[in-house]
Amino acid sequence: MIIGIGSDLIDITRIAKVIERHGERFLDRVFTEAERAKAERRAKKSELVAATYAKRFAAKEACSKALGTGIRQGVWWRDMGVVNLPGGRPTMVLTGGAKTRLDALTPPGMTARIDLSITDEWPLAQAFVVISAIPAAAEQAVHTSS
């Protein structure tokens, strides 16, 4: 069962300019430590760093839309973090107000699953989020059979 869908498209140069202007203040306010570490591993090319941050920014916007709140109602930037599963597939980890909102949307006996697609083609980055509720037993079976 689909709980929410969100998408976002952003100009990578906009994120690059914000990073240039506000630096650490912006990065600390918006991105998790894991997201920052991922971007910094790409530091040899400033375009790659900006694109990495832009994709994650778009993912947070898309996720907040899928939650039905936007960045308000207790859902903040750092409550949503992009992580990669062992096979490399991106997903999101929610904490704080975002996790509280997700839990409120998830029906009893179900587990929330967040599917994320992120991409970039200079100068644009895009993210698409689908939040689904799946039976808790099915989620357990997936984790035990992997």
Swiss-Prot record:
- Show the GO cellular component annotation of the record: cytoplasm
A Pfam match is ACPS
- Record-listed Mg(2+) binding positions: D8, E61
Question: What biological process terms from GO does the record include?
Answer: fatty acid biosynthetic process
Q: What is its EC number?
A: 2.7.8.7
Localization per record: Cytoplasm
Q: Which reaction does it catalyse?
A: apo-[ACP] + CoA = holo-[ACP] + adenosine 3',5'-bisphosphate + H(+)
Task: Please name the SUPFAM superfamilies in this protein's record.
Answer: 4'-phosphopantetheinyl transferase
Q: Which UniProt keywords are present, listed alphabetically?
A: Cytoplasm, Fatty acid biosynthesis, Fatty acid metabolism, Lipid biosynthesis, Lipid metabolism, Magnesium, Metal-binding, Transferase
For the keyword Cell division, the answer is no
| Alphabetized InterPro entries for the sequence | 4-PPantetheinyl_Trfase_dom, 4-PPantetheinyl_Trfase_dom_sf, ACPS, Ppantetheine-prot_Trfase_dom
Q: What protein family does this chain belong to? A: Belongs to the P-Pant transferase superfamily. AcpS family.
- Protein name, per record: Holo-[acyl-carrier-protein] synthase
Q: Which gene encodes it?
A: acpS
